[in-house]
Amino acid sequence: MNNKTGALSGVTVIDLTWVLAGPYCTQMLGDLGADVIKIERPGSGDDTRKFAPPFVTDNEGKETTESAYFMSANRNKRSVEIDLTSKAGQNIIRKLVLEADVLVENFKTGNLSKYGLGYDDLK
């Protein structure tokens, strides 16, 4: 549920992006008030979670394994792990898309179609 304010308040975005440009795009949408739901791979999440230093520090000032880049590029987002390669995960994505206003992805052309999640499958 989105209780944020901003130009995109009330807009729901499904974020199937990873690494640099995609997360930055959805970061800006979240900064403008959109409810961004980031989908990550089970077990490892976005590749940038472990990008090189600087790392975020914990309450005791010790470095964690969470990269500052990841935390910045994924602010104003909710995150959930969903396995896109499983039928159950694909069904969850389809249900989320039905309720969403926007889907942003930056996979190689055709990759999501292999899982029944391409543009023609979801439009």
Residue ranges and their predicted role:
Residues 1-123:
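N-terminal helix-loop segment corresponding to the beta1-alpha1 unit
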